[in-house]
Amino acid sequence: MPKKDGAIEIEGRVVEPLPNAMFRVELQNGHRVLAHISGKMRQHYIRILPEDRVVVELSPYDLSRGRIVYRYK
């Protein structure tokens, strides 16, 4: 997985789906963030359901929002 420069990758669990392909994700450290699906996952029609384990990429500028870049099988 290519990583964006300066982005922080952390594992989490999807808590609830929200409209417009957004999800509330609980990170390993207990924080909850708002995350959207990355473009490549959208292109390949990867479905994300509640309770899925995912990898979230957080920007160092806004740690309350992120991008889901991987869903564990």
Swiss-Prot record:
Species for this entry: Frankia alni (strain DSM 45986 / CECT 9034 / ACN14a)
Domain of life, source organism: Bacteria
Protein name as annotated: Translation initiation factor IF-1
PROSITE patterns, per database record: S1_IF1_TYPE
Role of this protein: One of the essential components for the initiation of protein synthesis. Stabilizes the binding of IF-2 and IF-3 on the 30S subunit to which N-formylmethionyl-tRNA(fMet) subsequently binds. Helps modulate mRNA selection, yielding the 30S pre-initiation complex (PIC). Upon addition of the 50S ribosomal subunit IF-1, IF-2 and IF-3 are released leaving the mature 70S translation initiation complex.
Residue ranges of every copy of the S1-like domain listed in the record: 1-73
Keywords: Cytoplasm, Initiation factor, Protein biosynthesis, RNA-binding, rRNA-binding
Organism classification: Bacteria, Bacillati, Actinomycetota, Actinomycetes, Frankiales
Family, as annotated: Belongs to the IF-1 family.
Subunit field text: Component of the 30S ribosomal translation pre-initiation complex which assembles on the 30S ribosome in the order IF-2 and IF-3, IF-1 and N-formylmethionyl-tRNA(fMet); mRNA recruitment can occur at any time during PIC assembly.
